[in-house]
Amino acid sequence: MGQREMWRLMSRFNAFKRTNTILHHLRMSKHTDAAEEVLLEKKGCTGVITLNRPKFLNALTLNMIRQIYPQLKKWEQDPETFLIIIKGAGGKAFCAGGDIRVISEAEKAKQKIAPVFFREEYMLNNAVGSCQKPYVALIHGITMGGGVGLSVHGQFRVATEKCLFAMPETAIGLFPDVGGGYFLPRLQGKLGYFLALTGFRLKGRDVYRAGIATHFVDSEKLAMLEEDLLALKSPSKENIASVLENYHTESKIDRDKSFILEEHMDKINSCFSANTVEEIIENLQQDGSSFALEQLKVINKMSPTSLKITLRQLMEGSSKTLQEVLTMEYRLSQACMRGHDFHEGVRAVLIDKDQSPKWKPADLKEVTEEDLNNHFKSLGSSDLKF
């Protein structure tokens, strides 16, 4: 066998090995380790969901989605279930997002996982948003991307001082999905637009002050709060709200500190009220304050395509229902999978970690209206339907 043939054989073998590794991660396994990625327990009249991948900051997998969705639906219909609690194991994270590295690697290996993953993830986001039973998300630790989708659409979101919120998708060539187009434009003023385009991180009580959490509890009291919720007998929504309100009122950490963005809200509202990303950049340049220039520096590092998609996503989402937004975001997700920037962003941030993505196109002015329209185009029979 010649050297060239040997090289071809080795290349094929390596590709085969990569594909098998990816499939191993994504397969709907019956094995214990896959089942234990999420714990589903009935405690009295409460259904408890525990995201259980602490080594991976409870990043969301297709297997987890496929366990949570049917159980959530069952509990919603069960007359003996009065409350649903969702939390993360390990203390560091509620959920750091979807396992996007695996999705990107699968796409590169021609394993079409993304259409299934995003479809089922968004179906779950909608199920959380439409859940008829009180739904309490204990967002302690890192809560980003897919973790936001599992919490923000529910009735109650309880943050602690360890909560770290962000929608950092424009830095990896994506957009703030999982219903970001619904909840972000509904935050005060233009705060949601600012968070979406810059990926700015909010911590602790600021997650509550921004309107993302409904309550704040000191982390040392979180276990007690959960115990008190579990002790409720056939509680009404009002009973649950009362317990949460009591803990919120008693919380002490950062109680007297003002919202971290309070002094900048006027700038945020004026700079981010523009209808194009180019105008937002111009507004920040003209403002010239250290805060504005800092945000300008951040925005200039993001994927130009992602920035334009995101602004339009939020503008359109401001007048849509959650289901309409998720249908739109599914179209965007599939367009991003077909494109360059998502895979390049994952490479630069999560794989090689050189933090130097080479975006294509690299300049905002090269992202045309036609490019944008193609991202938002209907997928016909492949559209997400509820």
From Swiss-Prot:
Protein name: 3-hydroxyisobutyryl-CoA hydrolase, mitochondrial
Residue numbers of Phosphoserine PTMs: S234, S356
Localization: Mitochondrion
Recorded disease: 3-hydroxyisobutryl-CoA hydrolase deficiency: An autosomal recessive inborn error of valine metabolism. It causes severely delayed psychomotor development, neurodegeneration, increased lactic acid, and brain lesions in the basal ganglia.
Record: transit peptide: 1-32
Residue runs in coiled coils: none
Residue positions binding substrate: E121, G146, E169, D177
Keyword tags: Acetylation, Branched-chain amino acid catabolism, Disease variant, Hydrolase, Mitochondrion, Phosphoprotein, Transit peptide
InterPro entries referenced in this protein's UniProt entry, alphabetically: ClpP/crotonase-like_dom_sf, ECH_dom, HIBYL-CoA-H
Organism: Homo sapiens
Top EC group: hydrolase
Entry keyword Cell wall biogenesis/degradation: no
PANTHER family from the UniProt entry: 3-HYDROXYISOBUTYRYL-COA HYDROLASE, MITOCHONDRIAL, 3-HYDROXYISOBUTYRYL-COA HYDROLASE-RELATED
Source organism superkingdom: Eukaryota
Gene (name only): HIBCH
Residues bearing the modification N6-acetyllysine: K55, K92, K221, K297, K353, K360, K365
